[in-house]
């Protein structure tokens, strides 16, 4: 099954300290897909997609495990650094899923509204306190028109890559 191969590839992604600080929700229910299509800028292709994966930054599982093993001792709540690692883990896994899909001719689209409509999606997926949906990956076989579509132009590397330290945009770079 190609979807399982995609999920397996996602799970093999590099992860901070091998902690796997993310979860993947495989959305199969058509009613949920329909709600996602509406909550994410009314994009009907979401509801029609054969594969919809939600990548969740997930520190809840570790927090629960720490509480279990610590018994009566107080457990440290996750902080900003923990969530940044969880975000990174989730996004790296999502990108691995994209590459795996592309290797099988399956296209993908990242949907950022999963973050923008956080409260709605938290409730829709029954997400606990120390979790955040960070990426929705909608996957399927591209229509012929999509195959011919030109890829959007990306920034030139001189606007993205700095050497040894961060470079601010100066007037010259902005005007270029």
Regions found by a protein language model. Name each.
Residues 1-176:
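Acidic, surface-exposed loops and disordered segments
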């Amino acid at each position: 099954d190609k979807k399982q191969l995609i999920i397996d590839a996602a799970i093999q992604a590099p992860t901070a300290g091998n902690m796997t600080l993310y979860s993947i929700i495989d959305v199969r229910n058509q009613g949920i897909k329909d709600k996602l299509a509406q909550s994410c800028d009314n994009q009907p292709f979401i509801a029609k997609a054969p594969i919809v994966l939600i990548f969740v930054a997930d520190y809840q599982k570790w927090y629960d495990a720490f509480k279990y093993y610590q018994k009566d001792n107080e457990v440290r709540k996750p902080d900003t650094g923990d969530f940044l690692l969880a975000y990174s883990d989730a996004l790296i896994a999502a990108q691995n899923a994209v590459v795996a899909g592309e290797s099988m001719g399956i296209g993908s689209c990242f949907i950022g509204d999963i973050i923008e409509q956080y409260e709605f999606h938290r409730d829709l997926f029954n997400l606990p306190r120390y979790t955040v949906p960070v990426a929705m990956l909608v996957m399927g076989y591209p229509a012929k028109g999509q195959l011919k579509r030109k890829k959007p132009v990306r920034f030139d590397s001189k606007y993205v890559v700095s050497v040894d330290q961060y470079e601010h945009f100066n007037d010259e770079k902005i005007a270029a």
